[in-house]
């Protein structure tokens, strides 16, 4: 056996040993470019869970893990909101084309997985759902619909009911931070994480019609102040 052959074998042995050097990152530890992240747990956990909750609920923003919401909102609606955000609210744009960090494919993957994991078509089978979006209705008719469907929890004027842990839904700062579509979504889908029923109401209640939903939203939107925060306290 020649010395050259022995040296070659030794070099190959050293190279093979490099594959298991101490400190070498495992496959799961290797850096992945942000635009190549595909796992739902990573995409949702890094971009959505801070507002919408680790499991799509119990976060400061509305739950996405909500069968009624996912039944009303189409894939196109979810992709548009995720991509472009909601101007004037705390929902940012995530699409790279809109200044965010996610590719169109990553956003489509997020929406597909959210629906696969959290949608429950059987929960709304046979239910006539109001459309996701619609023009504002009539505020005066909305006052009557609000009185019959909402006032028992939120108060006759929307400022809440003494002894009930529900804040004002006519607070100027709140209305300044929520869009008309945000109000509509809440009226339709409720807030299951906060104990608020959807448009069907509680047991024995009469569901709101599509027209009544639009009217209630108009009633609330009409209370949005032009300049949130006023009147300002007098300076001494």
PLM feature spans:
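Flexible coil segments in periplasmic/lumen-exposed cytochrome c-class electron-transfer proteins
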Residues: 22-30, 34, 38, 45, ...
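Gly/Gly-Pro-rich "capping" loops immediately C-terminal to redox-active cysteine motifs
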Residues: 30-31, 37, 41, 53, ...
């Amino acid at each position: 056996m020649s010395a050259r052959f022995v040296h070659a074998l030794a070099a190959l042995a050293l190279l093979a040993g490099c594959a298991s050097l101490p400190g070498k990152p495992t496959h799961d530890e290797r850096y992945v470019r942000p635009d190549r992240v595909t796992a739902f747990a990573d995409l949702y956990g890094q971009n959505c869970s801070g507002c919408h909750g680790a499991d799509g609920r119990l976060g400061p923003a509305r739950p996405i893990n909500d069968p009624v919401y996912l039944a009303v909102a189409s894939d196109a609606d979810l992709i548009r909101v995720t991509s472009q955000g909601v101007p004037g609210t705390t929902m940012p744009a995530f699409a790279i084309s809109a200044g965010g960090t996610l590719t169109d494919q990553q956003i489509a993957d997020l929406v597909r997985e959210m629906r696969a994991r959290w949608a429950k078509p059987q929960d709304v089978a046979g239910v006539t759902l109001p459309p996701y979006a619609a023009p504002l209705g009539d505020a005066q008719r909305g006052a009557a619909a609000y009185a019959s469907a909402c006032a028992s929890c939120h108060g006759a004027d929307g400022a809440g009911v003494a002894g009930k842990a529900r804040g004002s839904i006519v607070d100027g700062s709140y209305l300044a931070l929520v869009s008309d579509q945000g109000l509509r979504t809440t009226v339709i889908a409720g807030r299951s994480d906060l104990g608020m029923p959807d448009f069907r109401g509680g047991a024995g209640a009469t569901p709101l019609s599509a027209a009544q939903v639009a009217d209630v939203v108009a009633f609330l939107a009409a209370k949005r102040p032009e300049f949130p925060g006023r009147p300002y306290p007098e300076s001494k």
